[in-house]
Curated annotation (Swiss-Prot):
Positive regulator of arginine catabolism. Controls the transcription of the two operons rocABC and rocDEF and probably acts by binding to the corresponding upstream activating sequences. CDD domains: AAA (cd00009). Residues 143-372 form the Sigma-54 factor interaction domain. Disruption phenotype: Cells lacking this gene do not grow in presence of arginine as sole nitrogen source. GO terms for biological process: arginine metabolic process; phosphorelay signal transduction system; positive regulation of DNA-templated transcription; regulation of DNA-templated transcription. Induction: Not induced by arginine, repressed by RocR itself. This is Transcriptional activator RocR. GO terms for cellular component: protein-DNA complex. The modification 4-aspartylphosphate is found at D57.
Length: 461
C-alpha cells in the first residue's frame, strides 16, 4: 500500500511538471506547497526559493489584494481569467492571466490553487512597440555602396516610395533589409506617420494575434483596450520582419486583414478600418519558402507587389572596403580612437572572404578588431577576432631560398626554416613584443618562447 501511494505521488508530480500551465498551491497560511516546472519558467524562479515559503515573502505585489491566491484564501471565492502583475525576488516584472480556486475541507478554507498563463512577453512587446512608434533613423543616403548590384536595388526602392503598395524585401541575414525599409518609409508620403517594426520570429504563436490586432477590454478579466500593430501603424508603415517564420494559419489571418483593410481586436465584434503600408522581409528565396510550405502562395502574391532582392556582400566586393572604412570611422567616434588604415593582408582577406553574415558580420569584425587596439592606426591580422585571424595568410613572405648547389633539405628542415622565418618577421613587426607576436601568430606566449629557445639552441649547435 505504501508503495502504491509513493507511485501515485510520483505520477502526480510528473503530471504537474509536464503540463503547459503554471501551477502554484499554497496552504491556509499562504505557504507554498506545490510549485510546478512551468511556474518556475514563468516566474524565473527555482523551486527551493519558493517551496515552503510564504507567498508574500517571495513575491512583491503593489498591495496584498493584488495576489489572487491571497484573495482566494481570504474570500473563499473562485477567481477566473484575471490579469495579475507582480515582481519576483530579482525585481523582474511578471504578468499572468490566472484562474484561482480556494481549497475547502469541512467548510474551512485549507489553501488555494492558482493556474497561470504567462503574458509577460506580450505586455513587454506591446510596450516596446509603443516606444518605437515613429522611430526611424535611416534614409537612402545611409545605404553605402557604388557597386551596380546595390545601386540597382536603391533605384528601384526609390521608385517604390511614390506609392503605398506592399513591398517584399528578400535577402540573407545582415544584408540591410530594415535599412531599406526605413528608407522607403522616410522617402514616401507616409514619412510623417508612424513606422512600426516587428520581428515575427520573436513572437510565440499564442501571442501573434494579440500583438498584430490588439485586445478589447473584457476579452479576459484585467484586459484593457490595447491597440495592435496595425492600429499603431495607422497612417504609416508596418514592417513585418521574417514573415516566413509565422505559421500558415496565422499567415491566412494576416492575408485577410490585408485584403479587407480592416482588423478586429481579440474579444471585439467590431471591425476597425486600417490605412497601413506593409513592408515584409524574408531571409530566404520566396519561391523556396513557398515550396517548403513556410509561406502561403496567396500571401506572397499579396505582399510582392514590389519585390526587392538585396544582394549579399560577396556579390558586391567593390563595396567591402568602403563599408569597412565607414565602420572604422563610426567606431573611432565611439571609442575615441584614430584608426586610419587596414593592412594589405587584411584587405586581401576581406575581398576573398565569403561573408555569410554579410554587412553585419563586417561591422562586428571591425568593432572587434578595434577593441584589441590601443594607439595603433592600422588594423592588422593580429587585431582580428581569433576565428578570422587563423584564415589570413601572411602577406609578402618569400619562400626561403635553397642554393642550387646544395641538396634540398628534407621536409622537416624546410618546415622549421619557414617557421623560424615567419616568427622572426612577426617579432620584428611588433618590436620583439612577445605578447603581440604570439597573438598575431595565434599561439600562446609559452609556445612562442619555447620555439625561440629551440631556434637559439639549433643555431648554437
Amino acid at each position: 500500500m505504501v508503495k502504491d501511494s509513493e507511485f501515485l505521488t510520483l505520477v502526480f508530480q510528473s503530471i504537474l511538471d509536464e503540463i503547459d500551465v503554471g501551477l502554484h498551491v499554497v496552504d491556509e497560511h499562504g505557504n507554498t506547497i506545490v510549485y510546478n516546472n512551468k511556474m518556475m519558467q514563468i516566474e524565473d524562479m527555482e523551486k527551493h526559493d519558493v517551496l515552503n515559503k510564504n507567498l508574500m515573502d517571495v513575491f512583491m505585489f503593489s498591495k496584498q489584494q493584488d495576489s489572487t491566491l491571497v484573495q482566494a484564501l481570504q474570500e473563499g471565492k473562485t477567481i477566473k481569467n484575471v490579469k495579475q502583475s507582480y515582481f519576483n525576488n530579482k525585481g523582474q516584472e511578471i504578468t499572468t492571466i490566472n484562474h484561482t480556486y480556494p481549497i475547502v475541507q469541512d467548510g474551512k478554507i485549507r489553501g488555494a490553487v492558482e493556474i497561470a498563463k504567462d503574458v509577460t512577453k506580450l505586455e513587454r512587446l506591446i510596450r516596446e512597440n509603443m516606444n518605437k512608434k515613429g522611430s526611424t533613423t535611416y534614409t537612402f543616403d545611409s545605404i553605402l555602396g557604388t557597386s551596380p548590384a546595390i545601386q540597382d536595388v536603391i533605384e528601384n526602392a526609390k521608385r517604390a516610395t511614390r506609392t503605398s503598395s506592399s513591398v517584399l524585401l528578400a535577402g540573407e541575414t545582415g544584408t540591410g533589409k530594415e535599412l531599406f525599409a526605413q528608407s522607403i518609409h522616410n522617402g514616401s508620403d507616409r514619412s510623417g506617420g508612424p513606422f512600426i517594426s516587428q520581428n515575427c520570429a520573436a513572437l510565440p504563436d499564442s501571442l501573434v494575434e494579440s500583438i498584430l490586432f490588439g485586445t478589447k477590454k473584457g476579452a479576459f478579466t484585467g484586459a484593457v483596450d490595447q491597440p495592435g500593430l496595425f492600429e499603431q501603424a495607422h497612417g504609416g508603415t508596418l514592417l513585418l520582419d521574417e514573415i516566413n517564420s509565422l505559421n500558415l494559419s496565422l499567415q491566412a489571418k494576416l492575408l485577410r486583414a490585408l485584403q479587407e483593410r480592416k482588423i478586429r481586436r481579440i474579444g471585439s465584434t467590431k471591425d476597425t478600418p486600417i490605412d497601413v503600408r506593409i513592408i515584409a522581409t524574408m531571409n530566404e528565396d520566396p519561391i523556396d519558402a513557398i515550396a517548403g510550405e513556410r509561406m502561403r502562395k496567396d500571401l506572397y502574391y499579396r505582399l510582392s507587389v514590389v519585390t526587392l532582392i538585396i544582394p549579399p556582400l560577396r556579390e558586391r566586393k567593390e563595396d567591402i572596403l568602403l563599408l569597412a572604412s565607414e565602420f572604422i570611422q563610426k567606431n573611432n567616434h565611439l571609442f575615441q580612437m584614430n584608426v586610419e588604415h587596414i593592412s594589405d593582408d587584411v584587405k586581401q582577406f576581406f575581398l576573398s572572404y565569403d561573408w555569410p553574415g554579410n554587412i553585419r558580420e563586417l561591422e562586428h569584425m571591425i568593432e572587434g578588431a578595434m577593441n584589441f587596439m590601443t594607439d595603433e592606426q592600422t588594423i592588422t591580422a593580429s587585431h582580428l577576432p581569433y576565428q578570422y585571424r587563423m584564415k589570413i595568410k601572411p602577406a609578402d613572405i618569400p619562400e626561403p631560398e635553397t642554393p642550387r648547389h646544395q641538396p634540398a633539405a628534407d621536409l622537416k628542415e624546410k618546415m622549421e626554416s619557414f617557421e623560424k622565418y615567419v616568427i622572426e618577421n612577426v617579432l620584428r613587426k611588433h618590436g620583439h613584443n612577445i605578447s603581440k607576436a604570439a597573438q598575431e601568430l595565434g599561439i600562446s606566449r609559452q609556445s612562442l618562447q619555447y620555439r625561440l629557445k629551440k631556434f637559439s639552441h639549433s643555431s648554437n649547435e
